[in-house]
């Protein structure tokens, strides 16, 4: 499943253990 992850000033999608 995909969830929204915030990393510093960047926002990316995390797919399982893959970021």
UniProtKB/Swiss-Prot annotation:
It comes from Streptomyces griseoverticillatus (Streptoverticillium griseoverticillatum). Keywords: Antibiotic, Antimicrobial, Bacteriocin, Hydroxylation, Lantibiotic, Secreted, Thioether bond. Belongs to the type B lantibiotic family. The modification (3R)-3-hydroxyaspartate is found at residue 15. The keyword Membrane does not apply. One of its GO terms (molecular function) is signaling receptor binding. There is a cross-link at residues 6-19 (Lysinoalanine (Ser-Lys)). There is a cross-link at residues 1-18, 5-11 (Beta-methyllanthionine (Cys-Thr)). This is Lantibiotic duramycin. Signal peptide: none annotated. Maturation of lantibiotics involves the enzymatic conversion of Thr, and Ser into dehydrated AA and the formation of thioether bonds with cysteine or the formation of dialkylamine bonds with lysine. This is followed by membrane translocation and cleavage of the modified precursor. GO terms for cellular component: extracellular region.
């Amino acid at each position: 499943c995909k969830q929204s992850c915030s990393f510093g000033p960047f926002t990316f999608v995390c797919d399982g253990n893959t970021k």
